[in-house]
């Protein structure tokens, strides 16, 4: 999937390092590359005991996310292990860490509906959400009442997305969107093993890109009952169509 990184005044080195880390993660965790560690694990070519520490950590994280979402986020929803729904947000987070280690505190990373934005100044990032009914347009969030107020912290910085025009304005925080309007009915409800189709789109904003991505997938699988579940997530804001 296309990945964009915006670092005001960033030099070539920081871009190269960030993209190199993203390629490294893709080579290890892709389910489409037959030689990736995940693919070999799925095909039983590697025992779980012999997996890399990084993959073991991801498996543990996927199991924890499954438990925290009452099973609605599952890397095993389709039968075979597929950590893609977790790894995408984690990969963005990893790239963000590399950028910050190089001294850059203002940046924006976007990949397939997931966005991580950071700023140490007055700069805000205006983020549009694709309209699932008319993908050529942006979703008008002013017409959607948020189902949760947001006040979360990223380190000692406050993440406070605000609705602007049709989208969100963010200084420090994350936005993750899940839907079936681009890739078809690819999100499975782990409870009944059927494609989730009650909703068209779920957008979650909050302080952490990994958890926002997990929540977007889980709530999409839940359908409308996801509104009630989000009451247990006070640091995250929900928009659904």
Give the ranges of each region predicted by the language model.
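Mature catalytic core of soluble alpha/beta enzymes
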Residues: 1-241
């Amino acid at each position: 999937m296309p990945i964009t990184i915006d670092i005001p005044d960033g030099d070539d080195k920081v871009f190269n390092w960030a993209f190199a880390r993203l390629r490294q993660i893709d080579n290890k965790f892709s389910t489409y590359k037959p030689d990736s560690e995940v693919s070999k694990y799925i095909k039983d070519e590697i025992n779980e005991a012999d997996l890399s520490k990084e993959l073991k950590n991801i498996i543990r994280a996927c199991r924890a996310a499954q438990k925290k979402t009452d099973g609605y986020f599952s890397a095993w929803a389709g039968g075979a292990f597929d950590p893609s729904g977790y790894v995408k947000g984690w990969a963005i987070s990893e790239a963000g860490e590399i950028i910050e280690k190089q001294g850059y505190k203002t940046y924006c990373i976007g990949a397939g509906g997931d966005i991580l934005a950071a700023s140490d100044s007055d700069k805000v990032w205006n983020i549009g959400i694709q309209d699932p009914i008319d993908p050529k347009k942006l979703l008008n969030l002013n017409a959607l009442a948020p189902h949760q107020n947001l006040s979360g912290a990223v380190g000692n910085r406050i993440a406070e997305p605000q609705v602007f025009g049709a989208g969100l304005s963010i200084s420090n925080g994350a936005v993750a969107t899940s839907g079936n309007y681009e890739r078809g009915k690819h999100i499975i409800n782990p409870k009944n093993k059927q494609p989730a189709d009650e909703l068209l789109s779920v957008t979650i904003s909050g302080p952490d890109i990994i958890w926002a991505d997990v929540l977007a997938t889980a709530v999409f699988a839940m359908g409308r009952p996801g509104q009630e579940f989000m009451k247990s997530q006070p640091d995250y804001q929900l928009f659904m169509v």
